[in-house]
């Protein structure tokens, strides 16, 4: 059986951080420190150097790929003699809880929107497509929140298929991390973006991951370019615990927070609680459902200590 390294060598071009940084060429840095501060996630130390070395080359690559897709579309339309509706280029970002998917998505949204070829870039998280809390309780899935079966896949696929078909207006449900539930009286309006970034735990899943006898489309069927943010599990668990401690003194202190009871834990209790949540929910979900989809990504961002990217793998 081939090792993981052999598989990566066969499928991907590997770039060390310094090698990848050289591919930026002359792409300017358009973010400043205050703007970057607004994009950072909890407990992340993302710097302008990280943006310059990792995200600017990625922004350049994606701009070239999107441009090639747009040109191909023009050629095809001329050949067919038609003018179809505007279809956004769809980028997915997958990875574990606490790996920094949301920050990666926000940074790419900010950078890609600076290119004149595709100024309108929308970002949607799959959190809004989780079943409402009452439905999760009814199905006995509250302790499996984040697992594939906890998502309303019919709604999610309907949303992304409408986007792919060029629908001029599509609504995405929103999620509240305070109430730990879908927001019922508001939504996100998506109106013909040039690029749509969709970020979530399971966006790389395919029919291979479905139960036997299940036939349904998946998000990955509609995605043009996929990114997986990767890190070793011991780092992910540490980052999750660190983030839990940050939330305990921040978001959890809100009396309206679903997790307000955690705000009363001392350091030792909080670390034990977070570790137990990881070991019983997030860790198993990573091993069973998320990590097995990694090598389907077009690009893998590998993180080391302090959330810094150490290597980039680009599919051949």
Swiss-Prot record:
The family this protein is said to belong to: Belongs to the prokaryotic pantothenate kinase family.
Any Pfam family the entry gives: PRK
Domain of life (superkingdom): Bacteria
HAMAP family, sorted: Pantothen_kinase_1
Compartments in which it is found: Cytoplasm
Gene Ontology cellular component annotations, sorted alphabetically: cytoplasm
Enzyme class at the top of the EC tree: transferase
Primary localization class, coarse: cytoplasm
Record gene name: coaA
SUPFAM superfamilies the record matches: P-loop containing nucleoside triphosphate hydrolases (SSF52540)
An individual GO BP term: coenzyme A biosynthetic process
The protein's name: Pantothenate kinase
């Amino acid at each position: 059986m081939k090792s993981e390294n052999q598989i990566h060598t066969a499928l991907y071009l590997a770039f060390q951080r310094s090698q990848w940084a050289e591919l930026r060429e002359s792409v300017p840095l358009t973010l400043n420190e205050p703007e970057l501060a607004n994009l950072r996630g909890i407990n992340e130390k993302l710097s302008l150097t990280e943006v310059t070395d990792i995200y600017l080359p990625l922004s350049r690559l994606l701009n070239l790929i999107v441009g090639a897709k747009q040109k191909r579309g023009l050629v095809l339309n001329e050949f067919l003699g038609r003018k179809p509706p505007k279809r956004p280029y769809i980028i997915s970002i997958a990875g574990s809880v606490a790996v920094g998917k949301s920050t990666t998505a926000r940074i790419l949204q900010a950078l890609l929107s600076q290119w004149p070829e595709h100024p309108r870039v929308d970002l949607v998280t799959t959190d809004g497509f989780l079943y409402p809390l009452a439905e999760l309780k009814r199905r006995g899935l509250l302790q499996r929140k984040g697992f594939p079966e906890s998502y309303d896949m019919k709604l999610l696929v309907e949303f992304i298929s409408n986007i792919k078909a060029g629908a001029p207006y599509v609504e995405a449900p929103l999620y509240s991390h305070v109430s730990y539930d879908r927001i019922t009286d508001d939504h996100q309006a998506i109106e013909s973006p040039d690029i749509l970034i969709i970020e979530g735990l399971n966006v790389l899943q395919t029919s291979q991951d479905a139960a036997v006898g299940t036939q349904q489309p998946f998000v990955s069927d509609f995605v043009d370019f996929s990114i997986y943010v990767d890190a070793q599990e011991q780092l992910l668990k540490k980052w999750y615990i660190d983030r839990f401690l940050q939330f305990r003194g921040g978001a959890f202190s809100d009396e309206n927070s679903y997790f307000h009871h955690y705000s009363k834990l001392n350091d030792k209790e909080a670390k034990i609680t977070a570790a137990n949540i990881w070991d019983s929910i997030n860790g198993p979900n990573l091993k069973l459902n998320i990590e097995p989809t990694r090598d389907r990504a077009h690009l893998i961002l590998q993180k080391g200590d302090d959330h810094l990217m150490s290597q980039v793998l680009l599919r051949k």
